[in-house]
Curated annotation (Swiss-Prot):
Cofactor notes: Uses Mg(2+) and Mn(2+) equivalently.
Catalytic activity: RNA(n) + a ribonucleoside 5'-triphosphate = RNA(n+1) + diphosphate
UniProt entry keywords in alphabetical sequence: DNA-directed RNA polymerase, Magnesium, Manganese, Metal-binding, Nucleotidyltransferase, Transcription, Transferase
The encoding gene: yonO
Additional note from the record: Encoded by the SPbeta prophage.
Organism placement in taxonomy: Bacteria, Bacillati, Bacillota, Bacilli, Bacillales
General function of this protein: A single subunit DNA-dependent RNA polymerase (RNAP) that catalyzes the transcription of DNA into RNA using the four ribonucleoside triphosphates (rNTPs) as substrates. The enzyme is more highly processive than the multisubunit RNAP from E.coli but is considerably more error-prone. It has no detectable proof-reading function but can perform pyrophosphorolysis. Transcribes the late genes of the SPbeta prophage starting from yonK (approximately 35 genes are encoded in the prophage downstream from yonK).
Protein name: DNA-directed RNA polymerase YonO
Top-level lineage group: Bacteria
KW Transferase (keyword) present: yes
Enzyme class of the recorded protein, top EC level: transferase
Length: 839
């Protein structure tokens, strides 16, 4: 999809700083003294013989300095000022294009100071800047939002007050904090996450808001056998219960004329998945065209030309608007923007993870070898099989976000024989072995696809008013057009309890007519959403049709039913600086990974207790919601004792590969399912074979006679050495190093303002000396190298013998001049020898 590709190719750059950037001079002096003391303490630790009094002195000095620093924080009562010396190149991060960057008009590839990210190390300073804001360049900045991802890393987003004043209505569709507070406030962390919707990496979506409505969700009671956990006593009771399930939780519909593919959407206060479903055809079939929106107003979907139906679960702040017309009017008045993201792409190959594998506890060695065979084959073929090498390098037509190097490999595969490409493959192989030993296994025909509800059942409720709709899918059947009729295993991450949704994939013409996407559609009579813990706002499932895995999953799911317990409701509060600060500090204290790791300890132990895992799964979900609900169940003493007894061990041995743990911090290897992979996955060194024609670097040059330029080469070496310092952001993803390479490119162009010249100089320098490390060249000038290759392939050919570029005199020409002459001489010698022998 062009829009998606454009959205994920565009980036802007902003500063990401930490709370030390707001120190006053006294605090900064104390901070530097503490750092100096830490360095001295580290120096003492390296010495063999140190007088105890030195250790005692430095420890007490650090404690004393910290106390002085905290006192200085408390003494500071003015608005804080950003220290300009903190705005360094290594504090720049890259953001993908989003509603926020588009609304603010931040130009692509520019460095903007409209917004800044602040990471918290000292809570007193966070409290100050949330309460009073901060000053930079005579502009006041105020707290804007913190997304779920930012909360996990104690980060917050701040915005220029003048910018917020200008664009606030466009970002909030005219819904002010004052208006929310006048109606009783909101859950702070929910409000935070809804404000952060504008931050999502996305592409622009031209939505006609007048052709959209919002209706009530489809909720029904589903009768099911469950393990009911009493959240007060922790007692687990297996019984049949009527479970309320909101089948359309986060999901809406659009006419297929708008899009044949599902995608996620973002509008102010609106998020979720839109699935193409022809609700007009449904209305015409039943001659019923009137639907009610969430406010009770009736709409004729034909006369009103309704093309999109959102659900109440998608419209997060619907209660704060007077009507849907109120929202539509403000959306247009303030120039609000729509966005689309994650358009479905089932071509992405799926992989099993350790969480999915570890719950298959009775798997045999032979079965595990079979399941691992595709991964083992790919690892062993790396270096000798061209297709495998191209695939792991991402040089495939399926890859929609190809880099210049990946594009170049597709048109000039001889690059596979270059040392730089070989180095990438070597590192890729190490990574593949590590991944495989930690449970990431390739499975034939495994695909990721969206989880979709039975929208036919939704229309039966919406258009026909049927309280207990039947829908198209009956029982626990599912429909996914990617697979033939038969059993499939539906999986979702995180996978904590035994959560293999083995279901019958039903195929018929009626399903194909209504369910037009490759998503997996689930029945409204099936509690599968409780088993797999999903909603339908864009959650993806991994679908596996492999018969062996499906049968193993079936075997392990015998006697497993969904877990059920009553969750708490989010608490409303007034949105103000004090409550925002308190909500953030609560959220910062949550460690969801701890529960996941403790559950993994039990699955990989020699004594698996399902009840303990059930309790931990429940606690995990309460922990996730804690920042919103402020409720956490209290363990009874006997339960606490039992849980602690089971989680006292270290994490499993495979965490050396899965989480980079040291040998001393993991358990000894045992016979658990994932640990067994250690002996199945090969770790032998890579051996390269010539898999394509001979490589000639001159195909990468525009000017074949280019002379080396020492000034350019020396500056390149200096910048290449220093790029690690520039790439300071621990979270920066491979696609987010753009700013660093932008700086390097600018510095090189200051020496010689001709990027074609610089590219040729660097290509000749790096490829002639057979450097293994050419990433900076490809990141900075890869587009020019790619154009050079394209041009040269039209003009030159690679000699079939030596690989060198030559200008062919005819289409049949295969050899360069010297090899051609040698070939002719050899041919003549052979002919003469044959003639003499014949005589």
């Amino acid at each position: 999809m062009k829009g998606k590709k454009d959205g994920l190719n565009k980036q802007v750059h902003i500063y990401s700083i930490d709370t030390s950037a707001f120190y006053n001079d006294q605090e900064n002096k104390l901070h530097n003294k503490i750092l100096k003391s830490y360095r001295y303490r580290d120096h003492l630790r390296k010495l063999e013989h140190v007088d105890k009094k030195h250790k005692k002195y430095i420890t007490q000095r650090i404690i004393s300095l910290k106390e002085k620093l905290y006192n200085a924080f408390n003494d500071h009562n003015q608005i804080r000022t950003l220290r300009t010396d903190s705005l360094k190149d290594n504090n720049v991060i890259s953001l993908f294009d989003s509603v926020l960057t588009r609304t603010l008009g931040i130009k692509e590839n520019s460095l903007s100071e409209e917004i800044m990210v602040v990471q918290t190390y000292h809570f007193q300073i966070l409290r100050d800047i949330i309460d009073k804001g901060f000053i930079h360049n005579n502009e006041k900045y105020v707290y804007f939002t913190s997304s779920a991802g930012q909360i996990r890393t104690k980060k917050s987003c701040f915005i220029k007050q003048s910018t917020l004043d200008k664009y606030q209505n466009a970002l909030t569709c005219g819904l002010s904090v004052e208006h929310i507070n006048a109606q009783g406030g909101s859950s702070i962390n929910k409000w935070n996450s809804y404000m952060a919707l504008s931050n999502s990496a996305s592409s622009s979506w031209e939505i006609d808001i007048d052709k959209a409505i919002v209706v009530n969700d489809l909720e029904t009671n589903v009768s099911s056998l469950v393990d009911y956990i009493d959240r007060d006593t922790y007692e687990i009771t297996r019984k049949i219960m009527d479970i309320p399930i909101e089948h359309t939780d986060g999901c809406g519909m659009m006419l297929p004329s708008l899009s044949q593919k599902s995608f996620m959407v973002r509008l102010p206060w609106v998020k979720g998945l839109l699935v193409p479903f022809d609700f007009r055809k449904f209305a015409e079939k039943h001659s019923s065209f009137i639907v009610k929106d969430v406010y009770g107003k009736e709409w004729d979907i034909i006369k009103d030309d309704i093309q999109i139906i959102f659900t109440k679960s998608q419209f997060k702040m619907w209660k704060y608007y007077d009507s849907w017309d109120d929202y539509r009017y403000k959306f247009k008045k303030y120039g609000c923007l729509g966005a689309k993201l994650n358009e479905e792409d089932p071509s992405v190959e799926g992989k099993l993870t350790y969480q999915m594998l570890q719950t298959l506890t009775d798997i045999t060695d032979e079965e595990l070898k079979q399941i691992s065979s595709k991964t083992v084959s790919e690892i062993t073929q790396l270096g000798t099989d061209k297709e495998t090498m191209m695939k792991v390098l991402g040089a495939t037509e399926k890859n929609k976000h190809k880099t210049s190097l990946q594009e170049a490999l597709l048109i000039y595969p001889e690059l596979l024989n270059d040392d730089h490409t070989k180095e990438i493959i070597k590192n890729k192989k190490k990574s593949m072995i590590k991944d495989a030993k930690s449970g990431k296994l390739l499975v034939s025909d495994a695909r990721y696809t969206y989880l979709c509800p039975d929208l036919y059942a939704f229309c039966e409720r919406l258009f026909l008013g049927i309280e207990s709709p039947k829908g198209l899918l009956s029982g626990s059947d599912v429909h996914c057009s990617l697979y033939d009729e038969g059993y499939i295993d539906i999986l979702r991450s995180p996978h904590l309890f035994r959560e293999h949704g083995v279901r019958w994939n039903k195929k018929n013409e009626e399903y194909e007519k209504w369910f037009i996407t490759p998503g997996v559609y689930t029945s409204i009579h099936d509690p599968i959403s409780k088993l797999l813990q999903f909603d339908n706002d864009g959650d993806k499932a991994l679908i596996i049709s492999d018969e062996l895995i499906v049968n193993i999953a079936k075997r392990n799911m015998a006697d497993i039913v969904p877990l059920y317990y009553e969750m708490s409701v989010a608490q409303k509060q007034e949105i103000n600086s004090r409550n925002i600060y308190e909500a953030l500090t609560l959220a910062y204290g949550i460690n969801i990974g701890e529960y996941s790791n403790n559950i993994t300890k039990i699955w990989n132990s020699d004594n698996i207790n399902l009840d303990v895992i059930k309790w931990l799964c429940m606690e995990n979900n309460f922990t996730i919601d804690f920042a919103k609900t402020l409720f956490m169940p209290t363990r009874p003493d006997h339960v606490d004792e039992k849980i602690k007894d089971y989680i006292k061990n270290k994490v499993p041995h495979f965490f050396i590969n899965a989480k980079d743990k040291e040998e001393h911090s993991v358990e000894s290897i045992n016979e658990s399912t994932v640990n067994k992979l250690d002996s199945i996955i090969p770790s032998d060194r890579i051996n390269f074979a010539a898999v394509a024609g001979k490589f000639d670097y001159r195909f990468l040059l525009k000017n074949k006679e280019i002379k080396l330029n020492e000034a350019v080469i020396n500056e390149y070496k200096r910048l290449d050495r220093n790029k690690k310092w520039l790439m300071n952001d621990e979270e920066a993803k491979p696609g987010q190093k753009l700013y660093v390479y932008k700086i390097i490119k600018q510095k090189l162009l200051e020496i010689h303002n001709d990027d074609g010249f610089i590219t040729d100089v660097l290509v000749k320098h790096l490829y002639k000396k057979k450097s293994k490390y050419k990433s900076t060249l490809w990141e900075c000038f890869g587009d020019i190298v790619l154009e050079n290759i394209k041009h040269n392939l039209k003009t030159f050919k690679g000699c079939c013998i030596c690989g060198k570029a030559f200008k062919p005199t005819s289409n049949k020409a295969k050899y360069c001049q010297s090899c051609g002459k040698k070939k002719e001489r050899d041919k003549y010698k052979k002919y003469n020898k044959k003639r003499i022998n014949h005589r």
